[in-house]
A protein has these predicted regions:
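Catalytic binding pocket for nucleotide-activated donors in carbohydrate/polymer assembly enzymes
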Residues: 223-249
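Acidic donor-binding loop of glycosyltransferase active sites
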Residues: 207-221, 231-232
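Glycosyltransferase donor-sugar binding loop
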Residues: 168-169, 190-196
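Conserved active-site histidine-acidic residue motif and adjacent donor-binding/catalytic loop
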Residues: 61, 194-208, 221
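Short hydrophobic signal-anchor/transmembrane segments that target glycosyltransferases
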Residues: 174-188
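Short internal beta-strands
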Residues: 34-41, 189-193
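A nucleotide-sugar donor-handling region in carbohydrate enzymes
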Residues: 110-171
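Active-site and donor-binding regions of nucleotide-sugar-utilizing enzymes
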Residues: 5-27, 38-129, 134
Length: 249
């Protein structure tokens, strides 16, 4: 069975798409299906792809190579903000079952399956079509294997330990202001942009989350992992595509 996952990520655009797709990769592997990751990214994303079958390639520039590679596949999953409608249409013609991760009803998708695991997904009013199946709402959130089972969390009413993570995006000025404000009264751990989820292995990230009394985070994929661990979140909208997610929460 040939299954491909097309996505993107890196220091300049963050790692949320790769993180989400890694969860699906882990789930498919669990049932004996080993997909191939095709990742439009840079060196900073490779640690997220550790122990997977992957190829780092700009599949938007190498379209013909990509289409030839996925031709006849059982399934192709796309998680992208960069691919346009013609690209999706071409993919839908190359495989039996195309699957599209979506966050904002970004495109008019061709035939296939649209997955939006955000809490606001039903409010987007996707068009009803016979050739598209929709999987909407938080029951379809894709989490990495390390977050499938988590220890029970005790919520501390007194905040002592704070975790700060903004994913792969570089928000140094904002981070610096937060650190200056907190450093006199709290213990805090922060994960710098470019190292988040790359040099910090997932198991350590999970441990840091569990130890935190509260987490200051961006409003992307990390919020779902924090919610899974039952950690109180102060979420900050760091990009336009996070706004719907935070409104839904």
């Amino acid at each position: 069975m040939k299954v491909f996952i097309l996505t993107e990520g890196g220091k300049n655009i963050g790692f949320g798409h790769i993180t989400r797709c890694r969860g699906l990769y882990d789930a498919l592997k669990e049932i004996g299906i080993i997909p191939v990751f095709l990742v439009n990214g840079d060196e900073t994303c490779k640690h997220l792809l550790r122990d997977t079958n992957y190829l780092v390639i700009d599949w938007l520039k190498e379209k013909e190579f990509c289409f030839e590679l996925i031709k006849g596949a059982t399934g192709v999953i796309i998680d992208s903000y960069l691919a346009d409608e013609p690209f999706y249409l071409r993919v839908s013609k190359c495989c039996k079952t195309p699957i599209y991760f979506d966050d904002t009803k970004r495109l008019s998708y061709p035939r296939g399956i649209v997955v939006n695991g955000a809490p606001y997904a039903h409010m987007l009013r996707y068009p009803k079509r016979k050739d598209i199946k929709y999987f909407l709402g938080m029951r379809y959130v894709s989490l990495r294997e390390e977050f499938w089972e988590v220890p029970q969390k005790t919520i501390n009413m007194t905040i002592k330990n704070i975790l700060i993570t903004f994913g792969g995006m570089d928000h140094y000025a904002l981070l610096n202001r937060i650190v200056v404000t907190l450093k006199k009264n709290f213990n805090f751990t922060f994960i710098k942009a470019g190292t988040a989820e790359t040099r910090v292995v997932v198991t350590k990230m999970k441990s840091l989350i569990h130890k935190a009394d509260v987490c200051i985070s961006g409003g992307g994929q990390t919020t779902f992992e924090l919610a899974r661990c039952c950690v109180p979140i102060i979420a900050i909208c760091l990009a336009d595509n996070q706004l719907f997610n935070l409104r839904g929460l």
